[in-house]
């Protein structure tokens, strides 16, 4: 449903993403444990996988992970409504993306940073493919992006080494969620990017990449 992957007409729920990730890993014929990394919505997906297959996972690294919120945004209640939600999404989704896809970070001195003029065309290219809006709407309706703390609690019992990287100025997945992360994963590592926003993967990639590599190397 994202990037250049297929956009089947189906329910985009936890099971779909979990099964897709499972198929991908099996297709690579990996015969050892994996270090799994999830960004934003990928945080819960990676964590669901680790909770389901703990004996196959060495570590989990979360980048600005969704699912630690204590409250549900008002917008979601509108979008989940039949007919009204469909109409709203058809009419306004492109406009929302026109604003929402702008980087929160106006400047980055990271030499590997992807600038706005390069990022936006790549991001917006997805919108021209049939099924993108539908898959995104289905995800919002069927995948819990906001509060999956029960799943995280279950994962914490597996005693898998955990890392979370979070921008303190994240306007998409609030930094306040890091408090719940630390409560649930009391032995987990938290790296805070003081000036980081939600786009730390492509605006501060050097810091993010280095922290993940160092974390894995120490295991």
Can you name each region flagged by the protein language model?
Residues 150-152, 174-183:
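Short alpha-helix in the alpha/beta-hydrolase fold that links the catalytic acid
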Residues 71-73, 77, 91-157:
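Conserved alpha/beta-hydrolase catalytic His-Asp/Glu region
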Residues 158, 164-166, 170:
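Short beta-strand/loop motif that positions the catalytic acidic residue
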Residues 1-37, 210:
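Active-site loop/oxyanion-hole signature of alpha/beta-hydrolase fold enzymes
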Residues 144, 169-173:
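Acidic catalytic loop of the alpha/beta-hydrolase fold
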Residues 187-219:
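Catalytic active-site module of serine/aspartate enzymes centered on a nucleophile-bearing elbow/loop
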Residues 38-42, 46:
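Gly/Ala-rich beta-loop-alpha elbow adjacent to hydrolase catalytic centers
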Residues 48-51, 58-91:
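Flexible "cap/lid" loop of the alpha/beta hydrolase fold
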